[in-house]
Design a protein with these regions (language model features):
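Helix-to-beta-strand junctions that scaffold the AdoMet/dcAdoMet cofactor pocket
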Residues: 59-61
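C-terminal hydrophobic helical "lid"/dimerization subdomain
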Residues: 53-57, 97, 101-147
């Protein structure tokens, strides 16, 4: 990702390594800490054309790339030759599809969503909620609108 708060939160939630793609050369970082082997599971969450295009070079042979981030321009350069040579798999996630029931169950069972639901807004302030989510991506992970 490119938002440091999100990366910090990922570490608190159990990630073993994260890389801020705005600050570091992701390819060099991954090569160094995997001794050139690559990553078993690559999750691209930023939705940046640059970070999406890097994923074939990050995944290890037989690994999996999961594309979560949505690029503003749907046309992104992607090296399928690298994917084929590594026999890697590509998965995509359309954000929240089929997750509502699981999310409701998790919250009902006591999971703490405080790190994810970082901001709450009353319905009357819906415009403010959208503006915060769009303009303050560094701090707003998810904005909750109370009905």
């Amino acid at each position: 990702d490119m938002a440091q708060k999100r990366l910090d939160d990922a570490m608190k939630l159990g990630a073993t390594r994260v890389i801020n793609a705005k600050e570091k050369d992701v390819l060099k970082e991954v090569e160094a800490f995997t001794n050139g082997v690559g990553i078993e599971k690559v999750f691209e969450t930023a939705g940046s054309p640059v970070t999406i295009a890097q994923t074939p070079y990050l995944v290890k042979k037989g690994g999996t790339i999961t594309l979560v981030g949505m690029a503003a321009d749907p046309k992104v350069k992607f090296n399928f030759g690298q994917i084929m040579a590594k026999e890697a798999r590509i998965e995509s996630v359309f954000r929240y599809r089929n997750l509502y029931a699981k999310a409701i169950s998790a919250v009902a069972n006591g999971i703490d969503i405080g790190m994810v639901a970082t901001h709450e807004f009353d319905f009357e302030h819906i415009q403010e909620a959208y503006e915060a989510a769009i303009n303050d991506k560094e701090n707003v992970v998810k904005a909750v609108i109370k009905l």
